[in-house]
Structure formats: C-alpha cells, structure tokens
C-alpha cells in the first residue's frame, strides 16, 4: 500500500497543478457546447490580436499575460471540432454535446405559435432590426464578463431550456 501512495500523491499534485493553470475567465466561462461559450487561449502578444469565428469577430480580452478569445457558440453548432481564425492561423477547439431541459407549453392563442401574415410582417421587420444589432461589433471591453443576476426575486424558468409551443419546437 505505501508503494501506491507516492504515485497517487504525485498524480494528485499534477492534476491540481494543471487545473490551477487555467485562468479565472476560462474556469468561469468555458462551456464549449452548442449555445455555450468557448474560451480559446491566443497566447501572449504586445497588442490585442484579432479573432473570428464563423466569419464574425469575437471578443478578445487579456488576462495576466495571455489574450483570450471569448467565442459564443450557436445552438445550431454541431458537436465536434470547431475552428477559430486568429491573425492568419487556425485554432481548433472542441465543442461537446448538451441535452437541454425541455419545457412544453400549450397556448390557446395559436397566433402566438403560428403567426398570421400581418404578424409575420411585423416579426420580419423586428427581426431585421435585431440582426442589424447582432452584426454590430465593438472591440471595447465590457464592464463585466461574468454576468450578474439581473434582478432579485423568484426565478420563473432557467436560461437554456428547449421550448415547445403546442408541440412545435421554437427558438428561444
């Protein structure tokens, strides 16, 4: 038994040391699944590198001596290897799978599930405004990467739930 103790202790210390090397941002935000966030280490540099995922710019922040790319992963992303492009080089990262909890809602007003043509016209107009906002990108650092709870009070439902309205899945 004492002969097993030394290798077990060495392995434990190695595992602790490897976990300690991950940055606070990585430990807190890195949940690389569809609908999650990947934190990709870009390494050290004198100025902020530029990074893109799926042709779109991503937030780059500095923590200690390294730059990190904060990559939002679409819900439609297939599990497997994804690629971040950073100043001419490609950085692969793994996207895991995730089974989201489901919520099934039955609505009496079917227009809220399958809108009529007038509703669709308004929805399309509002969607165009949303897409315009989504396409804008500011390299300015946000005041807080770790989001705070928006309000105190009872939680009506968790974020990250697949919703079905009258049996039909809808985007959140």
Question: Which residues does each predicted region cover?
Answer:
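Surface-exposed, glycine-biased beta-strand/turn segments
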Residues: 26, 92-172
């Amino acid at each position: 038994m004492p002969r097993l103790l030394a290798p077990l202790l060495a392995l434990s210390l190695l595992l602790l040391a490897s976990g300690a090397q991950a940055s606070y941002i990585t430990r807190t935000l890195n949940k690389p699944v569809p609908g999650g966030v990947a934190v990709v280490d870009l390494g050290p540099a004198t100025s902020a590198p530029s990074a893109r995922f799926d042709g779109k710019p991503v937030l780059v922040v500095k923590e200690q001596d390294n730059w990190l790319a904060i990559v939002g992963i679409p819900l439609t992303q297939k599990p497997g290897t994804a690629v971040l492009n950073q100043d001419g080089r490609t950085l692969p990262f793994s996207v895991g799978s995730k089974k989201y909890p489901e919520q099934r809602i039955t609505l009496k007003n079917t227009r809220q599930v399958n809108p009529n043509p007038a509703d669709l016209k308004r929805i399309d107009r509002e969607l165009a405004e949303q897409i315009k906002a989504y396409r804008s990108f500011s390299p300015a650092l946000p005041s807080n990467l770790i989001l705070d709870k928006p309000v105190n009070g009872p939680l009506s439902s968790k974020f990250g739930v697949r919703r079905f309205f009258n049996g039909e899945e809808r985007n959140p």
